[in-house]
Regions:
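Active-site metal-binding core of divalent-cation-utilizing nuclease and nuclease-like domains
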Residues: 75, 79-86, 93, 97-98, ...
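Nucleic-acid nuclease catalytic cores
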Residues: 140, 144-200, 222
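Domain-level recognition of nuclease-like catalytic cores that cleave nucleotide substrates
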Residues: 186-253
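Short nucleic-acid-contacting surface segments enriched for D/E, G, S/T with interspersed K/R
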Residues: 40-54
């Protein structure tokens, strides 16, 4: 297995509390400072307080905040959960180029990023295959540690881009043999959890169904995230991604 190695090992710290959508107060070796959160989504259903975290440091004079929170620890083991969605695409590109993802696409001469398709811009074109990668964070599929506090779950509503991308992937099959929707988990799944229905559940459900019928393939990859780097842990093709990851939870009433 190849490892995506960080330029410098990540720094251990503690996320004391989330201050805004993009910032958090962190403690690094007793010093409190503000760090950037590289995701616009919430991190599961956990309270973002006193969470062990891994941070990258960026000595760029143009940056106001020098630290990014790259991962958090929600379990009692060293199963770090990567939260940087920009890093996800770098990892996917790396593992394709290292031929660690040949199960998904094996016949290609280059990996292209940010490729226009229809009215959308998809994440990748691997050889002749269009591929969209998503890093779901609203549900974290790990067994929480004893000190993790949870919050009442909230339904996810930002599904418009995903629906559009699925439709573009399905449409690409008119001229291409293959199209892939890839879920990227920057951690090892240890406990599968149900998601609440999104606020646009019916539209999302129908789009997944139509895309699968058109021939779009659904895959997921898990990773082993460490302070030094990231290793691919598993590659799985899902015959019924929608039911397995977007099913409704039982009524809470």
């Amino acid at each position: 297995m190849r490892t995506y190695v960080f330029e410098k090992p990540l720094i251990r710290g503690t996320m004391l509390k989330r201050k805004s959508q993009f910032t958090a107060l962190v403690d690094i070796d007793g010093e409190e400072l503000i760090a950037h959160i590289p995701t616009t989504n919430r991190i599961g259903d956990v309270e973002n307080k006193n969470l062990p975290c891994l941070l990258s440091y960026h000595d760029d004079p143009k940056r106001k905040l020098k630290y990014d929170i790259e991962a958090v620890l929600l379990s009692d083991d060293e199963n770090w959960v990567g939260i940087n969605q920009i890093l996800s695409n770098k990892l996917v590109e790396y593992f394709f180029n290292e031929h660690e993802l040949d199960e998904i696409v094996s016949d290609f001469d280059r990996v292209q990023r940010e490729v226009n398709l229809g009215i959308s811009k998809l994440d990748f074109k691997v050889g002749d295959t269009y591929l969209e990668a998503k890093t779901p964070l609203t549900t974290i599929n790990v067994k929480y540690g004893k000190n993790i506090k949870t919050l009442p779950p909230k339904p996810f509503s930002s599904t418009g881009r995903m629906v559009q991308h699925l439709r573009e992937l399905a449409g690409s099959l008119k001229d291409h043999e293959k199209a892939v929707f890839l879920q990227v988990f920057q951690y090892r799944i240890t406990e599968k959890k149900k998601r609440l229905r999104s606020t646009h559940y019916e539209e999302v459900s129908q789009t997944f169904k139509e895309s699968a019928e058109a021939g779009v393939e659904f895959w997921e990859i898990q990773m082993d995230f460490r302070p030094e780097g990231v290793t691919l842990y598993s590659v799985t093709k899902s015959a019924d991604l929608f039911k397995s990851t977007y099913r409704a939870t039982q009524d809470q009433s």
